[in-house]
């Protein structure tokens, strides 16, 4: 069996082996949610202004970082938008040095790492992100408008498949990595200033979120192992271990 996070995966996998489960996310992300304005204040941002969150993973994404640097004039001119920029720990010193050598950009806030992603997500009006399955599952459950820039450095280009699965449903905007330098920030600024577009993206991605993914997958594993669970409770199961890369495949 092949557990997938969204519909339309029969284009890439045998249809008779697919089961729609979603991807499990850490419970803390969807528990004790706070309002956008409260989250913005916790981050030291102005709730009255739009917020764009740029995340390239804990290590960072070179192309996203370079796109920020090449778009400084456009970012600087967008005074009513705040840009929270997670550079990744490998890039923070370089990016800060290059920013210091440039004209001041008061609405750009670089950081190497965001400890409280639940707060960062809550504060953001638009997210710019790679297209990993885990991140997409988080964004779907939270209903966040997102521009997905798939990493080209992954097995079988699976992030592009992830992004396409959402883009075809108008649940995300897909920009290839090769086009980010010219297209990313003009698109981001246009989208975050378009209330109807933001709303549509939020509503469509929220429909794709599956809240009980862990339970669905655990049931499938146990059924294949000859231990089907016929009740709604999995409290008698002590441990289920998953080992996977990119997606969950049960053979």
Language-model features: where?
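Active-site-proximal region of nucleotide-activated glycan assembly enzymes
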Residues: 1-40
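C-terminal alpha-helical cap of glycosyltransferases
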Residues: 211-230
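Conserved acidic donor-binding segment of nucleotide-sugar-dependent glycosyltransferases
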Residues: 173-179, 191-195
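ATP-dependent carboxylate-amine ligase
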Residues: 230-251
């Amino acid at each position: 069996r092949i557990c997938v996070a969204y519909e339309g995966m029969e284009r890439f996998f045998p249809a008779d082996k697919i089961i729609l489960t979603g991807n499990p996310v850490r419970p803390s992300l969807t528990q004790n949610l706070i309002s956008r304005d409260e989250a913005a204040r916790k981050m030291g941002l102005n709730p009255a202004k739009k917020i764009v969150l740029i995340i390239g993973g804990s290590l960072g994404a070179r192309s996203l970082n370079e796109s920020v640097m090449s778009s400084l004039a456009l970012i600087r001119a967008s005074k009513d938008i705040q840009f929270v920029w997670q550079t990744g720990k490998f890039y923070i010193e370089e990016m800060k040095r290059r920013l210091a050598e440039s004209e001041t950009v008061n609405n750009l806030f670089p950081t190497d790492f965001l400890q409280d992603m639940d707060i960062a997500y809550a504060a953001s009006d638009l997210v710019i992100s790679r297209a990993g399955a885990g991140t997409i599952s988080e964004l779907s459950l939270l209903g966040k408008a997102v521009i997905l820039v798939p990493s080209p450095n992954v097995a079988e280009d699976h992030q592009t498949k992830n992004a396409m699965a959402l883009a075809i449903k108008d649940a995300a905007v897909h920009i290839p990595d090769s086009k980010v330098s010219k297209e990313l920030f003009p698109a981001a600024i246009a989208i975050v200033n378009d209330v109807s577009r933001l709303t549509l993206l939020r509503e469509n991605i929220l429909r794709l979120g599956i809240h009980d993914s862990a339970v669905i997958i655990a049931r499938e594993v146990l059924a294949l192992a000859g231990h089907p669970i016929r009740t709604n409770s999995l409290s008698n199961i002590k441990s289920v271990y998953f080992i996977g890369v990119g997606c969950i495949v049960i053979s």
